[in-house]
């Protein structure tokens, strides 16, 4: 076999090897692209979901601070208020049509953000009043201002239907424009969220 023939044979073999390798690489690339599509479909969205269980001023306040901060950063934010957290959403107290236990709960629970106490050092409401004075002096937005800001920024606010039923809270007692939903509503939001918090 002459040198020319050897060179031609080598070139043909290299061409076959290169074609096989290119074909194998193309298949691997297709598989990787398919996996990437699948993974990107499973990634959480740019959103945060919070359960607001507490009805304490010093816990509801951070919920609204986080929600407005997230909304300002372009994230979708949702707050799911349940049990004692529902007190923050009350605009009035309505005893009509309620049973004895529901009336007792209604009388013992605060109405609205103004009535929320502190989780520590509340001292029959004095602690909460002092906290509000300090916040005003330090030019920190009040809970009421943050709640209004959150609504204006499109933060989704949901009241837990089951908790409303248990505590005897009527839809008419809560802020206008909020949603009422069950645990499925929260779970649907949380499943798509980057962050989920329990406050």
Regions found by a protein language model. Give the residues of each.
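Glycine-rich loop at the start of a catalytic domain that most often binds anionic cofactors/ligands
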Residues: 89-98
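Glycine-rich, aromatic-bearing surface loops/beta-hairpins
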Residues: 159, 164, 172-175, 179-199
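A short aromatic-anchored loop/beta-hairpin motif
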Residues: 145-153, 158
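Long, leucine- and charge-enriched amphipathic alpha-helices
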Residues: 4-45
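Histidine-anchored nucleotide/phosphate-binding helix
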Residues: 61-79
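Short internal beta-strands
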Residues: 77-83, 158-161
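Short, glycine-rich nucleotide/cofactor-binding loops
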Residues: 50-61, 134-135
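A glycine-rich helix N-cap at a beta->alpha junction
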Residues: 97-135, 139
């Amino acid at each position: 076999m002459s040198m020319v023939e050897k060179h031609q044979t080598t070139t043909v073999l290299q061409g076959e090897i290169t074609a096989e390798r290119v074909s194998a690489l193309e298949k691997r690339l297709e598989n990787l692209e398919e996996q990437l599509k699948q993974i990107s479909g499973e990634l959480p969205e740019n959103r945060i979901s919070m359960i607001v269980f507490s009805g304490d001023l010093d816990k509801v306040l951070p919920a609204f601070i986080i929600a407005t901060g997230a909304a300002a950063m372009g994230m979708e934010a949702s707050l799911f208020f349940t049990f004692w957290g529902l007190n923050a959403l009350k605009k009035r107290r309505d005893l009509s049509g309620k049973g004895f236990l529901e009336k007792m709960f209604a009388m013992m629970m605060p109405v609205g953000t103004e009535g929320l106490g502190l989780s520590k050092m509340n001292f029959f409401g004095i602690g909460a009043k002092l906290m509000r004075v300090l916040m005003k002096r330090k030019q920190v937005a009040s809970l009421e201002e943050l709640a209004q800001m959150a609504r204006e920024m499109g933060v989704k606010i949901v009241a837990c239907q089951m908790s409303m039923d248990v505590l005897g809270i009527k839809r008419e007692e809560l802020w206008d424009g909020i949603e009422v939903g069950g645990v499925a509503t929260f779970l649907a939001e949380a499943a798509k969220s980057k962050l989920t918090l329990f406050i």
